[in-house]
């Protein structure tokens, strides 16, 4: 099984996440500032993000963003290649 395809738009760093759109043939889910993006897992470089820390308040580098999004997707159970993930950043 391969991981979902992840697209970052626009491709610029450092960045803040504006929205995450998860799509498949029968499902579309969007996470944005209105339904705030919470993530309470450890990221690979051992920085802990508080459950109240929103994605859009963190300035991401390229690899940190990819690693954290993959952990977030695993947390949601989105681990199959039937999904395409669009990360909108500013």
From Swiss-Prot:
Signal peptide: none annotated. One of its GO terms (cellular component) is host cell cytoplasm. Disulfide bonds: none annotated. It comes from the Viruses. It is found in: Host cytoplasm. Keywords: Host cytoplasm, Viral RNA replication. Belongs to the orthopneumovirus M2-2 protein family. Mediates the regulatory switch from transcription to RNA replication. Acts late in infection by inhibiting viral transcription and up-regulating RNA replication. Inhibition of transcription by protein M2-2 requires phosphorylation of the phosphoprotein. This is Protein M2-2. It comes from Human respiratory syncytial virus. The lineage of its organism: Viruses, Riboviria, Orthornavirae, Negarnaviricota, Haploviricotina.
């Amino acid at each position: 099984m391969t991981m979902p395809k992840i697209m970052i738009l626009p491709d610029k760093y450092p960045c803040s996440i504006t929205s995450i759109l998860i799509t498949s043939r029968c499902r579309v889910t969007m996470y944005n500032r209105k339904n705030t993006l919470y993530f309470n897992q450890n990221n690979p470089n051992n920085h802990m993000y508080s459950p109240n820390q929103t994605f859009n308040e963190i300035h991401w580098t390229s690899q940190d963003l990819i690693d954290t999004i993959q952990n977030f997707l695993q947390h949601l159970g989105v681990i199959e290649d039937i999904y395409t993930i669009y990360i909108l950043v500013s």
